[in-house]
From Swiss-Prot:
Species: Rickettsia prowazekii (strain Madrid E)
Protein's gene: rsmG
EC number assigned by the record: 2.1.1.170
Name under which the protein is recorded: Ribosomal RNA small subunit methyltransferase G
GO annotations of cellular component type: cytosol
Enzyme class (EC, first level): transferase
Family: Belongs to the methyltransferase superfamily. RNA methyltransferase RsmG family.
Keywords assigned: Cytoplasm, Methyltransferase, rRNA processing, S-adenosyl-L-methionine, Transferase
Length: 191
């Protein structure tokens, strides 16, 4: 994956900020620090190949340490909203958002309480599909969901299909053999 040097520099600043804050608010597992670029940065950046237009509004739910939302903003997505219920993490996200040249809004609320619209909704290490869909019922996603998922993705799809109608594509993660990117659109509740 080719990344411009200016973006790499900003991502390095972001990495250093995470390392500094991680000591006090546990943003990422200490076990992932040695493999930070592959585990967190590239894992987030790989979503860019499924974002055809960077001039959109992207919402990242359960943003935590800013993956993938902050990374996608640094990579060029023009408007990103980060939804995070933990105030301490929101304070970190506000600091981290200054690294990007693009618009980042931090929303310190529970996801299910928010009514907003966007082109794309992302999340990483958040929850299963049913929970994601339930929590985001008040969010109007015009284009698609881009969800970074682990090895239980097929079970999640089968379970979600019992309550929801949706189209999906499964993409292989470039950072993890068992990881997948679920590209979901046309979501409607059936029960």
């Amino acid at each position: 994956m080719k990344v411009q040097s200016e973006i790499i520099e900003k991502l390095e600043i972001f990495q250093n900020l995470i390392k500094k804050w991680n000591k006090s608010i546990n943003l990422i597992s200490d076990n992932t620090i040695p493999n930070f670029w592959q585990r967190h940065i590239l894992d987030s950046l790989q979503l860019m190949q499924y974002i055809s237009n960077k001039e959109i509004h992207l919402i990242d739910i359960g943003s935590g340490a800013g993956f993938p939302g902050i990374v996608l903003s640094i990579a060029g997505v023009t408007k990103v909203s980060l939804i995070e219920a933990d105030l301490r993490k929101c304070i970190f996200l506000a600091k981290a958002s200054k690294i990007s040249n693009n618009s980042i809004q931090i929303i310190n609320q529970r996801i299910e309480k928010i009514e907003i619209d966007c082109s794309i909704l992302t999340c990483r290490a958040f929850s299963n599909l049913n929970t994601i869909f339930n929590y985001t019922q008040n969010i109007s996603v015009r284009e698609k969901f881009l969800l970074l998922k682990g090895k239980s993705y097929l079970t999640e799809i089968v379970e979600a299909k019992e309550r929801w109608s949706f189209d999906y594509l499964i993409h292989q993660s470039i950072t993890c053999g068992s990881g997948k990117i679920l590209e979901i659109n046309n979501l409607t509740k059936i029960i």
